[in-house]
């Protein structure tokens, strides 16, 4: 996301992401000043530094760094139905539930941030929407149905798009064959 600002881009990596506008024509939506991050397992030094950098560059946000020990304070997902879910699948469900219930910005815990995230609020206002995401051009075969990236999401609370995404993912995980 910020590679063009701080360092050269590796030409061998074809991983370009573009802005997508979800739910246009909303004129007064506000993204809450909350950043959500989640990590399951031992906290690597790199991840800890990423989280500290997010806090440092975004002092005007409440940064909620969640783990399996404190995630229940903010969302109530029934993991009893998901005994075989991977940590990545759990994180996906958590991100969609948090964004739907509370709004704010979801940022993967291992994301390196170089600047304040207020630019998201400006983009949302500029495009008259209540949410923000990137889509991956390389994986999108039909522009009407883009493949969204989920490492950086933003929305006002109660956006049905994120509730629907949660519900579809939950069904897919429940249908996954048990090994």
Language model features with spans:
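N-terminal anchoring/stem segment of glycosyltransferases
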Residues: 1-78, 157
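Extracytoplasmic/secreted proteins, especially bacterial periplasmic and envelope-associated proteins
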Residues: 46-49, 94, 160, 164
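Conserved interaction-surface patches within small, structured recognition/assembly domains
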Residues: 75-90
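Serine-centered coil/turn micro-motif
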Residues: 111, 159-160
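Conserved beta strand-loop-helix elements of the APE1-like EEP
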Residues: 149-158
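Catalytic core and acceptor-binding pocket of nucleotide-sugar-dependent glycosyltransferases
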Residues: 161-179
